[in-house]
């Protein structure tokens, strides 16, 4: 009797590891949440078909407010799988769930899977040069968060790249595009006027990471904001100081303007 946090990877049902698949198949009950990320290349039916068992999909409210009522009682009596997109422990929500499981006396295990934190290397930007990441959230009435702007500023001062996750409103089937994120960041720039994110800022967009044909594009905001990057999920990267190999990679594989080679 235990709770297994199992990652599904980034794109489709085939991204789950062999260990994760075997574990899910032996579990007596399977729950899943998809409000922290999106698997664009698959469906719930295909995941169920691969595992061979029905999956109970949980909402944000189910997970964050009723985990002790819905999932933990089951895990005290049988083996239970909790499926998540990406790697289970990347989302802070899931770390909290594991703490709650331990406090309830439920043994838990983590089975890793491909994560955006590793997949972002397909852009050619060196992983060790990434600083703190942040999420660009949709502004709402009387609420316009800007902390991600400050994260970009802090990272750039140290020459580091910034990985920006884009807001998800799964219950509304609303997934922020890189274009929307750039528009929001330009609005914040208009408010703060610190020259951190302008039409001349170099950005990198990675769409559908984990697929065989992800979209990787690099260029200046003034040009990129009008591009079509295809289906979500998207992530936006604001590069810091580029190494010559990083710049060459962006030119060759992401269509970056060759003039960036003159700046390294």
From Swiss-Prot:
Q: Which GO terms describe its molecular function?
A: diphthine synthase activity
Q: Which reaction does it catalyse?
A: 2-[(3S)-amino-3-carboxypropyl]-L-histidyl-[translation elongation factor 2] + 3 S-adenosyl-L-methionine = diphthine-[translation elongation factor 2] + 3 S-adenosyl-L-homocysteine + 3 H(+)
A Pfam family name for this chain? TP_methylase
Q: What is its EC number?
A: 2.1.1.98
* Pathway(s) per entry: Protein modification; peptidyl-diphthamide biosynthesis
Task: Tell me which residues bind S-adenosyl-L-methionine.
Answer: 10, 87, 90, 115-116, 166, 209, 234
Query: InterPro entries in the record, alphabetically?
Result: 4pyrrol_Mease, 4pyrrol_Methylase_sf, 4pyrrole_Mease_sub1, 4pyrrole_Mease_sub2, Dphthn_synthase
Asked if Protease is a keyword of the record, the answer is no
What keyword terms does UniProt attach to this protein? Methyltransferase, S-adenosyl-L-methionine, Transferase
Q: Which Gene3D superfamilies does the record associate with it?
A: Cobalt-precorrin-4 Transmethylase, Domain 1 (3.40.1010.10), Methyltransferase, Cobalt-precorrin-4 Transmethylase, Domain 2 (3.30.950.10)
Methyltransferase as UniProt keyword: yes
Q: Name one GO biological process term.
A: protein histidyl modification to diphthamide
Question: What is known about its subunit structure?
Answer: Homodimer.
State the similarity comment.
Answer: Belongs to the diphthine synthase family.
| Known role | S-adenosyl-L-methionine-dependent methyltransferase that catalyzes the trimethylation of the amino group of the modified target histidine residue in translation elongation factor 2 (EF-2), to form an intermediate called diphthine. The three successive methylation reactions represent the second step of diphthamide biosynthesis.
Q: What is the recorded name of this protein?
A: Diphthine synthase
Q: What is the organism of origin for this protein? A: Thermococcus gammatolerans (strain DSM 15229 / JCM 11827 / EJ3)
- Phylogenetic lineage: Archaea, Methanobacteriati, Methanobacteriota, Thermococci, Thermococcales
């Amino acid at each position: 009797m235990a709770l297994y946090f199992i990652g599904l990877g980034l794109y489709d049902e085939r991204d789950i590891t062999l260990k994760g698949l075997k574990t899910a198949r032996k579990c007596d009950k399977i729950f899943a949440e998809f409000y922290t990320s999106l698997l664009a290349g698959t469906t719930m039916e295909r995941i169920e078909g691969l595992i061979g068992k029905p999956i109970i999909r949980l909402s944000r409210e189910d997970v964050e407010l009723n985990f002790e009522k819905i999932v933990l009682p089951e895990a005290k009596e049988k083996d239970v799988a909790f499926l998540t997109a990406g790697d289970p422990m990347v989302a802070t929500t899931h770390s909290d769930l594991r703490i709650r499981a331990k406090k309830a006396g439920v043994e838990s295990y983590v089975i890793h899977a491909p994560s955006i934190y590793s997949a972002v290397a397909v852009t050619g930007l060196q992983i060790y040069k990434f600083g703190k990441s942040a999420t660009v959230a949709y502004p709402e009435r009387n609420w316009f968060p800007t902390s991600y702007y400050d994260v970009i500023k802090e990272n750039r001062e140290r020459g580091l790249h910034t990985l920006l996750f884009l807001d998800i409103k799964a219950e509304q089937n609303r997934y922020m595009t890189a274009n929307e994120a750039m528009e929001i960041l330009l609005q914040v720039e208009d408010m703060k006027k610190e020259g951190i994110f302008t039409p001349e800022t170099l950005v990198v967009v990675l769409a559908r990471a984990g697929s065989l044909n992800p979209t990787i594009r690099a260029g200046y905001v003034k040009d990129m904001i009008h591009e079509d990057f295809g289906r979500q999920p998207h992530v936006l990267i604001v590069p810091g100081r580029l190494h010559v190999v990083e710049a060459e990679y962006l030119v060759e594989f992401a269509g970056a303007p060759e003039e960036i080679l003159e700046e390294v």
